[in-house]
């Protein structure tokens, strides 16, 4: 079970299919790695399907109908689904849901000493990337002007909000400033989804933030 689960409202929107593709990808990876999140999404989808059945049958969707649906679901155990193994060499850590976005892309060195793979999405303005930090290394100190969604796929990292391991999900609000540092051991790999470019707050921020805003870094 994840120590840092995705918020309930995100799981609900994911189950309902109303999340933009970027956040939906992040939640899907969290669900693939965390059995508790997977069970929650399965139950939410079952509730939605059962309520639709009640509506199609012409029944009132009041409290009594909802209680009836929940009573039926309480007797159903949702078993975790085993995911098929990854097939791409060097990416054994990647859940299958991620592989179709990668194609033949490989790691590229980025400013700050980390590596990244940019993931382009059609029709979604979120910026999505895989980041890889070597043990003990960190990202530059930065803050966000909009939400950031992070799901850890390998290793772990620590910042001022806590320690995050495989399957953990983090939501960074715009006011938050942090400096994630990879834990000792293996490299930390995480999927990052941001609504808007980050703002560097360290010594180099004045010079590099314009490049970040224009997507040149």
Regions found by a protein language model. Give the residues of each.
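Short alpha-helical interface segments
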Residues: 12-13, 21, 25-89
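A short, N-terminal "cap"/entry segment at the start of jelly-roll beta-barrel domains
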Residues: 74-123
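Conserved short histidine dyad/triad with adjacent acidic residue
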Residues: 112-144, 173-177
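Glycine- and acidic-residue-biased ligand/ion/polar-headgroup-sensing regions
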Residues: 134-137, 143-159, 166
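Short acidic-glycine-tyrosine-enriched beta hairpin
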Residues: 159-179
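Ligand-binding loop in jelly-roll beta-barrel domains
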Residues: 176-200
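Double-stranded beta-helix
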Residues: 191-217
């Amino acid at each position: 079970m994840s120590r840092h689960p995705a918020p309930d409202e995100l799981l609900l929107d994911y189950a309902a299919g109303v999340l933009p593709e970027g956040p939906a990808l992040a939640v899907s990876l969290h669900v693939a790695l965390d059995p508790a999140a997977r069970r929650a999404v399965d139950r939410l989808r079952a509730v939605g399907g059962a309520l639709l059945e009640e509506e199609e049958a012409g029944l009132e969707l009041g409290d009594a109908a909802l209680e009836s649906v929940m009573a039926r679901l309480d007797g159903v155990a949702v078993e975790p689904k085993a995911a098929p193994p990854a097939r791409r060499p060097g990416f054994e850590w990647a859940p299958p849901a991620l592989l179709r976005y990668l194609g033949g892309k490989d790691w590229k060195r980025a400013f700050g000493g980390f590596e990244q793979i940019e993931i382009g999405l059609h029709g979604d303005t979120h910026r999505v990337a895989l980041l890889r930090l070597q043990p003990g290394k960190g990202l530059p100190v930065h803050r966000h002007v909009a939400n950031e969604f992070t799901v850890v796929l390998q290793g772990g990292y620590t910042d001022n909000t806590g320690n995050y391991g495989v399957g953990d999900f983090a939501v960074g609000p715009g006011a938050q400033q942090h400096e994630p540092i990879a834990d000792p051991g293996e490299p930390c790999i995480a999927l990052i989804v941001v609504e808007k470019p980050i703002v560097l707050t360290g010594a180099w921020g004045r010079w590099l933030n314009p490049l970040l805003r224009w997507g040149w870094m």
